[in-house]
């Protein structure tokens, strides 16, 4: 019984598109990252030079793998685009933006898997989604099966009236009796958007069509027109002498009513490597046919123009007669990215290695005379690095976003160096030169075409403005220590020996290391120790104020005088301090104690006393205070609140009356802020009056959308002073400075609903039961953008965050759901609140507007422009107080106090990225990394890297083979290096160069037994073992070697303290067959060489083989646990073996009978039961068990299959680590597995007990069936739908999906109570929360 949790989200951008999704006047960027859908807007920063940044509007975790995203313009809204999101399993969701919920809304879901699967014997794999430029239809293609979805379009008269607007976009969605329609929150009929979909075979359109390679809709046709490239005779490089030019190109005009087609043109005998069609919009026409060695342009009249771009073109086609020769460019076009530049006669082409090229067209009127390829000068994109670029999205203001598979994803501006006046003129006419990428222009607008042609002579400079981080692809990772200093600034290191994940990322020049730390790594500059304090504040960067709540003492320390005490006769020293505040730009200070309030000048001389005012509250104590600008809000233990306006110029204060309706209400806490929350209702109170009277407001359609986006919140005036109060019955109340007795509340905030709307406050006759402890209503963000958020801290330690947004009429708040679980209600997690939790707001911490949370596990709440708010663990030590800190050495830092009364002055490191669930630091290596390991004794990292070199084809004797044509460019081979990296400054301090064609396949740090065979006891030594593969020509099998190195201490070079270690060779040995896997077992090491597995013993005088095993194929994975061994191969899943040292032997214990291509595997151990987690090449996890006592296991010879689970990404590496038991520690050590994927995500699979599994399984079923899921996707179908029936039969206790289960914590209170009743009639609410805490904290011991 196990559960799956993805704790690091994918970062690799697989799909992107620019469209008018939210606003009709500006394009949004829609990004797909495996299962995450993100919506960005473009913002400009206020700098010397205008800079564009991507700002995340919202992100959505989908229960399915995103395979494509397209935009479509529907009849429901002529100004905004809808999105077609296709997902794995031939599913297509039509979604739109709901401005009233600040979220996506699912219009319809179209499910074609069963229809496609019943029409073919082939297994359904990937599908392609294409959209007709005029929004007439879409097509989801699986090989030769074409599924069309016709869309309703405006009639021709309306099209003529709205020529520019109606034609800019794409179309999309289907309603059919067999198709599901989920998630239409408006409850309106959507059948008017589209007609019934239909599926046809490509051969039905034209009998000449063979196997379809690619299909696209073409521009500049009034009727839907498709271009298809197909082949009837199969060809590949090996049979080119027999079969050449087997590709055909056909253009068909479709009739969606009769489902018939008319042939427009057909071209035969194209080269075999043509595999992609690029349709060209105006001012160009036709399409580009992309091959590996050539480009062919076919215009709308069927005229072809051909370019030969390397010397291999002559080998793949029968004649070069019609080709224009540009073979001197020597281009390799495999998987290149191609994008027409809007309103230009250039097409941008980016190769796999990141080189930029133009495909230039010479146009005479409307006729293309010729085209050629031109390299873009390196100076025009010198700071832009791309490796295997993917899709390209065009945006407003000449911006382009490029998805990058093996590196970060840049946002570029295309800046025209010349003819800038022409660009301006175009902007005046067409709003943006990049705005109408999918627009059908009038074919007869010659003047406009001529204007665009004038741009073609100008050069373009590509300027990088921003980029999205990409942690992938990850192929290998290790666990190590980022911070190893036991003490920092004479105090214990709060991150001492915290286990971090170190992985590879990227490739080629964008290759590097990722360092993922489970908590923030503050840079500690200095420290202080106190005898007894509980809270502290910094004032004006000059004074540190401390409070001792037990001994009722307060003290002042001077920061610039080595923290010397400052004595002040006016300062209240004999009481504990509740709050310290700064007034008038730190010219005055305000001290609040339980009984007194004083205002001091900069010399701590009292100028204002509140003693007379506070006499009426003599029997009460002040428990909390908050201050903003001139306003002080004071909360008393009796539940009363008082607001004062302090005038330091007149040395006076004025009491601010709160709305009378609150006079008899118990107030527990509050906040003063500058906010837009009440701007709309302050201008028009009817917004709430009409709502209370039951006036129904239309939530969809043209009018609502236009209203909501044409009334920006900026038009409602600047932010105003807003007072926020929390009542004893957990309502949040808001009113302005001049409230005129108007008091508003956030409706249903006590139930923590998904959306909070404003309403009039009405007193309730309820018994106070406060569970809201603290609130902060303020901005979160970085230096580029900030948004208003309501942050709520509950008594149980839960942290809830709501984002303020404008829905077109009023301001609302929407709950952020992608947050970790920090606490629980009903005292379910009492350990989390053993030290009081408080929210502390920081307006600037190294550029971030953030919130710190005190407690036994302190937290840091932060938000970047590219992310939603994140909650990070702040070090391993508890924290009882936080305060801002700045001096000559530290700017915008902080000082915090732990529970041992030690204070640390530190900074938040800016070289970490805070966009994901853990802080991530990237270390550039600028080479592809194959393997990484951590050497604990020397605290260094060893990596295996490789680079591309020209391939030298040699035979077994090392001589060049006969028949090699040296006049043509050679293929690529690889050369490997083993590098030693010091974490001191993350530089390479030693390198082992391997021979040409040799790569370090595996690098591992092992603790091996070393000594003579005659000795009974051997020494243990940590060594580096390297397994390599030596790759030769295709007719010769690969060989390899294993090498053993010790990392020794040396005297560092002068001025380079990091160079204090180097490699020392212990042993190396060549092997027959590549070494594909290595691992340590019982003090020896295992080497998998070819189809043989040998365990060797390291002795003083060499290496001795002690046990061996033969396999049928090569081993892809080898892991050990004690004396148990996993062996995984590429065909027959895994084998479980045991190793015995007396006598030396390997015993086969059991094997898995599935036919799996094993990528990686490792052990999961609980209660002395042995489970093995297998990750195959089909993005599926399999859990098997070794249980000799089970009668179905044939005495253990058969590993029992327990569960299978789809993870939507290719798994690459798995490591076993101990599991943290937060609530109920186990008597024996429990082991879980951490895994990585190619998309940059990390997951863990961990064992749980029977009772928790039963509760969580029922809860998961209820949430799956009853709750709303984005894009209408089914979580159960996502995890188990693609598995075979045989596997599903054995899924009696499937893996739990924590992604679904954790939705429980984000539901409103009523839904949570209702679901808990479905789990059990007994009171299991607290048990469910304990399970959630247990699941969320399995990695806490790192």
Swiss-Prot record:
According to its UniProt record, where is this protein mainly located? nucleus
Q: Biased-composition ranges for Acidic residues? A: 156-167
Q: Which species does the entry assign this protein to?
A: Debaryomyces hansenii (strain ATCC 36239 / CBS 767 / BCRC 21394 / JCM 1990 / NBRC 0083 / IGC 2968) (Yeast)
Q: Which gene encodes it?
A: CFT1
Q: Which domain of life is it from?
A: Eukaryota
Swiss-Prot/TrEMBL keywords: mRNA processing, Nucleus, RNA-binding
What this protein is called in its record is: Protein CFT1
The upper taxonomy is:
Eukaryota, Fungi, Dikarya, Ascomycota, Saccharomycotina
Give one GO term, molecular function aspect: RNA binding
Task performed by this protein: RNA-binding component of the cleavage and polyadenylation factor (CPF) complex, which plays a key role in polyadenylation-dependent pre-mRNA 3'-end formation and cooperates with cleavage factors including the CFIA complex and NAB4/CFIB. Involved in poly(A) site recognition. May be involved in coupling transcription termination and mRNA 3'-end formation.
């Amino acid at each position: 019984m196990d559960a799956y949790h993805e704790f690091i989200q994918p970062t690799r951008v697989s799909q992107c598109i620019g469209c008018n999704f939210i606003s009709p006047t500006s394009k949004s960027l829609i990004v797909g990252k495996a299962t995450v859908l993100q919506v960005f807007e473009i913002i400009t920063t206020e700098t010397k030079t205008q800079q564009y940044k991507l700002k995340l509007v919202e992100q959505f975790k989908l229960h399915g793998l995103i395979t494509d995203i397209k935009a479509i313009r529907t009849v429901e809204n002529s100004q905004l685009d809808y999105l077609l999101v296709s997902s794995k399993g031939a599913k297509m969701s039509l979604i739109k933006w709901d401005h009233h919920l600040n979220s996506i809304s699912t219009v319809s879901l179209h499910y074609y898997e069963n229809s496609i699967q019943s029409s073919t014997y082939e297994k359904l794999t990937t599908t392609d989604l294409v959209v007709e430029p005029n929004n007439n239809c879409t097509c989801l293609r699986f090989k030769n099966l074409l599924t069309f979805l016709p869309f309703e379009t405006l009639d021709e008269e309306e099209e003529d009236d709205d020529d520019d607007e109606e034609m800019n976009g794409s179309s999309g969605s289907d309603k059919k009796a067999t198709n599901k329609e989920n998630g239409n929150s408006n409850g309106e009929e959507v059948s008017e958007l589209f007609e019934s979909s239909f599926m046809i075979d490509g051969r039905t359109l034209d009998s000449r069509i063979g196997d379809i390679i690619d299909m696209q809709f073409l521009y500049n046709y009034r009727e839907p027109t498709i271009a298809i490239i197909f082949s009837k005779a199969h060809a590949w490089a090996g049979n080119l002498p027999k079969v050449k030019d087997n590709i055909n190109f056909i253009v068909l005009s479709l009739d969606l009513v009769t489902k018939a087609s008319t042939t427009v043109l057909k071209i035969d005998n194209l080269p075999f490597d043509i595999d992609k069609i690029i349709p060209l919009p105006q001012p160009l026409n036709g399409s580009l046919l992309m091959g590996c060695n050539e480009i062919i342009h076919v215009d709308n009249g069927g005229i072809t123009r051909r370019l030969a771009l390397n010397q291999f073109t002559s080998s793949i086609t029968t004649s070069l007669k019609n080709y224009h020769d540009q073979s001197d460019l020597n281009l390799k076009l495999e998987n290149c990215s191609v994008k027409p530049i809007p309103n230009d006669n250039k097409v941008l082409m980016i190769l796999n290695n990141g080189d930029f090229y133009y495909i230039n067209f010479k146009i005479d009127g409307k006729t293309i005379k010729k085209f050629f390829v031109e390299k873009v000068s390196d100076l025009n994109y010198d700071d832009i690095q791309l490796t295997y670029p993917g899709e390209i999205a065009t945006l407003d203001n000449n911006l382009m976003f490029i998805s990058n598979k093996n590196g970060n994803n840049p946002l570029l501006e295309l800046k025209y160096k010349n003819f800038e006046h022409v660009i301006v003129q175009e902007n005046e006419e067409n709003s943006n030169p990049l705005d109408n990428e999918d627009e059908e222009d009038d074919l007869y607008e010659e003047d406009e075409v001529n204007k665009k042609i004038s741009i073609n002579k100008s050069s373009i400079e590509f300027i990088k403005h921003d980029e999205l981080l990409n942690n992938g692809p990850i192929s290998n990772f290790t666990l190590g220590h980022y911070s190893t200093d036991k003490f920092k600034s004479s105090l214990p290191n709060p991150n001492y020996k915290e286990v971090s994940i170190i992985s590879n990322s990227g490739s080629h020049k964008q290759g590097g290391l990722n360092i993922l730390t489970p908590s923030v790594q503050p840079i500690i500059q200095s420290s202080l120790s106190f005898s007894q304090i509980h809270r502290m504040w910094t004032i004006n960067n000059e004074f540190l104020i401390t409070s001792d709540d037990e001994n009722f003492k307060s003290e002042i320390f001077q920061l610039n005088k080595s923290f010397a005490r400052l004595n002040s006769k006016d300062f209240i020293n004999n009481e504990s301090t509740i709050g310290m505040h700064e007034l008038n730009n730190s010219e005055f200070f305000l001290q609040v104690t339980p009984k007194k309030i004083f205002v001091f000048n900069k010399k701590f001389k009292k100028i204002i006393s509140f003693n007379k005012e506070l006499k009426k509250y003599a029997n009460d104590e002040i428990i909390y205070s908050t201050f903003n600008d001139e306003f002080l809000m004071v909360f008393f233990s009796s539940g009363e609140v008082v607001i004062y306006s302090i005038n330091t110029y007149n040395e006076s204060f004025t009491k601010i009356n709160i709305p009378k309706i609150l006079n008899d209400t118990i107030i527990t806490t509050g906040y003063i802020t500058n906010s837009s929350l009440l701007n709309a209702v302050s201008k028009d109170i009817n917004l709430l009056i009409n709502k209370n009277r039951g006036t129904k407001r239309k939530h969809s359609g043209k009018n609502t959308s236009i209203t909501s986006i044409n009334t920006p919140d900026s038009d409602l005036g600047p932010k105003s002073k807003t007072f926020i109060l929390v009542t004893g019955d957990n309502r949040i109340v808001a009113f302005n400075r001049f409230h005129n007795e108007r008091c508003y509340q956030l409706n249903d905030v006590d139930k923590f609903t998904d959306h909070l709307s404003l309403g009039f406050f009405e007193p309730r006759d309820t018994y106070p039961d406060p569970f809201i402890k603290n609130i902060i209503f303020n901005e979160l963000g970085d230096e580029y953008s900030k948004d208003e958020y309501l942050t709520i801290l509950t008594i149980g330690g839960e942290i809830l965050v709501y984002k303020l947004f404008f829905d077109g009429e009023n301001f609302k708040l929407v709950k952020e759901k992608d947050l970790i679980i920090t606490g629980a209600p009903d005292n379910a997690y009492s350990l989390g609140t053993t030290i009081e939790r408080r929210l502390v707001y920081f307006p600037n911490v190294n550029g971030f507007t953030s919130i710190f949370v005190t407690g036994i596990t302190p937290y840091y709440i932060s938000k970047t422009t590219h992310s939603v708010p994140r909650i990070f663990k702040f070090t391993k030590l508890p924290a009882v107080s936080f305060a801002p800190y700045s001096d000559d050495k530290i700017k915008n830092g902080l000082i915090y106090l732990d529970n041992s009364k030690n204070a640390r002055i530190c900074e938040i490191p800016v070289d970490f990225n805070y966009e994901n669930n853990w802080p991530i630091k990237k270390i550039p290596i600028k080479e592809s990394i194959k393997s990484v390991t951590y050497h604990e004794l020397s605290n260094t990292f060893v990596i295996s890297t490789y680079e591309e070199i020209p391939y030298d084809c040699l035979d077994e004797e090392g001589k060049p083979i006969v028949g090699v044509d040296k006049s043509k460019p050679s293929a690529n081979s690889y050369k490997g290096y083993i590098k030693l990296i010091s974490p001191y400054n993350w530089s390479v301090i030693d390198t082992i160069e391997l021979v040409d064609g040799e790569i370090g396949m595996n690098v591992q740090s092992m603790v091996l037994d070393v000594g003579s065979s005659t000795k009974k006891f051997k020494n243990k030594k940590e060594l580096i073992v390297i397994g390599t593969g030596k790759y030769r020509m295709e007719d010769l099998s690969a060989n390899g070697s294993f090498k053993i190195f010790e990392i020794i201490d040396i005297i560092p070079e002068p001025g380079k303290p990091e160079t204090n270690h180097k490699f020392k060779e212990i042993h190396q040995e060549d092997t027959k067959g590549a070494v594909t896997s290595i691992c340590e077992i019982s003090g020896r090491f295992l080497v998998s060489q070819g189809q043989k597995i040998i365990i060797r013993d390291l002795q003083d005088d060499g290496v001795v083989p002690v046990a061996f095993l033969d396999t049928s194929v090569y081993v892809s994975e080898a892991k050990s646990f004690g004396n148990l061994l996993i062996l995984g191969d590429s065909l027959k899943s895994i084998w479980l073996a045991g190793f015995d040292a007396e006598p030396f032997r390997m015993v086969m214990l059991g094997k898995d009978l599935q036919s799996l291509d094993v990528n990686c595997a490792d052990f999961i151990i609980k209660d002395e039961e042995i489970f093995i987690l297998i990750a195959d090449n089909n993005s599926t996890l399999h859990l098997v068990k070794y249980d000799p006592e089970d009668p179905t296991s044939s005495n253990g010879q058969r590993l029992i299959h327990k569960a299978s689970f789809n993870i939507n990404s290719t798994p690459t590496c798995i490591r076993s680590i101990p599991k943290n038991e937060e609530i109920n520690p186990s008597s024996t050590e429990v082991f879980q597995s951490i895994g990585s994927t190619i998309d940059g995500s990390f997951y863990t699979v961990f064992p749980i007990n029977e009772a928790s599994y039963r509760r969580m399984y029922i809860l998961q079923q209820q949430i799956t069936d009853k709750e709303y899921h984005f894009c209408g996707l089914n979580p159960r179908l996502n995890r188990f739908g693609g598995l075979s029936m045989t596997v599903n039969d054995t899924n009696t206790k499937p893996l739990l999906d924590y992604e679904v289960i954790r939705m429980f914590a984000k539901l409103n209170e009523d839904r949570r109570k209702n679901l808990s009743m479905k789990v059990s009639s007994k009171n299991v609410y607290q048990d469910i929360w304990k399970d959630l805490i247990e699941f969320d904290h399995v990695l806490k011991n790192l």
